[in-house]
């Protein structure tokens, strides 16, 4: 009997922990999952300082959640809120001869923009586009080393092996990537756990990224989305958005879709998680519980 490979994803947020077990690669199947709240005072999200204030409570919560998932899989892909790090889209004039050379050039380039000690930052990058003249477009992520080190240490104590650490916005994109990649000039707009995220692609390449925590009232969301679109259009006047996709919780989905339609003056495609994934045999989950696993499922898919 051939056993299908399974991926384990863990989302850490201000609301608590979400663990998801998935299989199937592009055709993602949910094999199990759960969300748990953390005791008050356990976590305080920060870009610079270690986030976990009560290590014992955090380790206990992770260990118990993993035990309840009834899996032997310990290698986990971890999703953190975008607010604990930074994301930069960077254009450079030449390709790198090696990844290390790339990291050195990126650090040098970023010194002018970020008044922080880049030596205390874990920096990673992904090449988005390579042009014929040798120029490259990069997606650069930055996380404080003390923040990463603490999470890795405590997750290890809880019995997990952190494999990848990524931001929630990209794990949400990863969850719907099969549909989103069918449209080359598209905007992905989501409101998830109090954060509004806007990703805009042109020619299949990520051209714009913005995420901001904001109250969920319609006027706030409208203002933030409109501001993002104004910045994008001012920066790239010749790059029209061809299609808009949106995502929100089941209760907020339809009002959010209407708000995105009003702001963009386009009819958006409302992404439905129940259509994007399947439930494995014996797995029972309602819409709200499944939505709460969104980022964890996106993270889990990275290991498949």
Where are the regions a protein language model picked out?
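Hydrophobic/aromatic-enriched cytosolic interaction surfaces used to assemble or bind macromolecules
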Residues: 1-304
């Amino acid at each position: 009997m051939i056993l299908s490979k399974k991926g384990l994803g863990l989302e850490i947020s201000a609301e608590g922990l979400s663990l998801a077990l998935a299989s199937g690669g592009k055709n993602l199947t949910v094999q199990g999952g759960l969300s748990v709240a953390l005791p008050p005072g356990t976590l305080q999200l920060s870009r610079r300082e270690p986030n976990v204030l009560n290590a014992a409570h955090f380790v206990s919560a992770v260990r118990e959640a993993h035990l309840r998932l009834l899996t032997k899989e310990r290698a986990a892909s971890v999703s953190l809120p975008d607010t604990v790090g930074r994301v930069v889209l960077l254009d450079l004039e030449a390709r790198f001869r090696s990844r290390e050379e790339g990291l050195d050039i990126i650090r040098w380039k970023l010194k002018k923009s970020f008044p922080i000690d880049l030596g205390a930052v874990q920096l990673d990058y992904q090449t988005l586009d390579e042009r014929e003249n040798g120029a490259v477009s990069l997606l650069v992520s930055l996380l404080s080393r003390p923040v990463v080190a603490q999470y890795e240490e405590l997750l290890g104590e809880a019995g997990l092996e952190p494999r990848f650490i990524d931001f929630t916005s990209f794990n949400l994109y990863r969850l719907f990537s099969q549909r989103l990649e069918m449209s080359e000039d598209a905007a992905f707009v989501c409101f998830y756990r109090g954060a509004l995220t806007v990703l805009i692609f042109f020619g299949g390449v990520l051209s714009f990224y913005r995420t901001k925590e904001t109250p969920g009232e319609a006027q706030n969301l409208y203002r933030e989305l409109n501001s993002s679109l104004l910045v994008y259009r001012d920066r790239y006047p010749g790059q029209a958005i061809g299609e808009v996709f949106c995502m929100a919780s089941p209760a907020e989905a339809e009002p959010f879709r209407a708000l995105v339609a009003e702001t963009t003056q386009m009819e958006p495609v409302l992404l439905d998680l129940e259509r994007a994934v399947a439930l494995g045999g014996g797995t029972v989950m309602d819409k709200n519980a499944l939505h709460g696993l969104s980022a964890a499922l996106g993270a889990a898919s990275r290991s498949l």
